[in-house]
Amino acid sequence: SVLQYIDDGDRSRGKVQHEILGNQLKKIESFVENNQINDAYFFCTQADITSCYMGYSVGDVLKYGTSVRPLYEKALEYNPNLSYALTNIGQWYYFAPGIVGGSKKKTLSYFEKARECAVTDSQKYFADIFLSQLLFEKKEFERCNSLLSEAESICPNSNYLKKIRSANQQGLSLFEYNRKKSSLDKESKKIE
């Protein structure tokens, strides 16, 4: 599938992936211009695609980065208890610089609420993981491990959880691990 191709981790395909996402963004923007949207999942999807699109260059981050949060906020206007939107806006607050509103305190608040509002196993799984990783950074290891164990009970033998535990054993949260391996960080260091 296209999504599997986009998310296979092979950065050598970056140009093609960026083009696919860019074309999809144009279609979404055109659809939004011509239709009244009142669906929380639509806004989450638009925000997710925008986030993926901007993950290929610092220029795109600067251009699109601040457009993501309002999309998740719009989703939460339609469904204030949508765990998926809460988890993702929490990630936005985590990665955004303070100058544009980023805040670990807000991240924690959104992750806690996402966990409270999680209904499906998938929502619980990701809410547990993301909250655990913020707690890992705050050195709240007991609660972090408890949440990871809860995620493992939902999805035993998960390779994703194995990767997270491995990162944690190296002293890195999932967020720190992802930032460390991001090609964007390498690109931004070239600019500095």
Locate the predicted segments by residue:
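Short coil/turn linker motifs that delimit alpha-helical repeat modules in TPR/alpha-solenoid proteins
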Residues: 35, 57-64, 78, 100-103, ...
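Alpha-helical junction/boundary sensor with strong preference for TPR arrays
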Residues: 25-28, 32-35, 72, 79, ...
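Outer-membrane beta-barrel transmembrane domain signature
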Residues: 95-115
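Amphipathic alpha-helical repeat scaffolds of TPR domains
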Residues: 1-9, 36-56, 81-97, 123-133, ...
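Single-residue signature of alpha-solenoid repeat helices
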Residues: 17, 21-24, 68, 107, ...
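TPR-repeat structural position
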Residues: 11-14, 65, 104, 141
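Boundary/linker segments of alpha-helical solenoid repeat arrays
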Residues: 28, 83-84, 115-124, 153-166
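Terminal, low-structured helical/coil segments at or just beyond the last alpha-helical repeat
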Residues: 126-130, 134-192
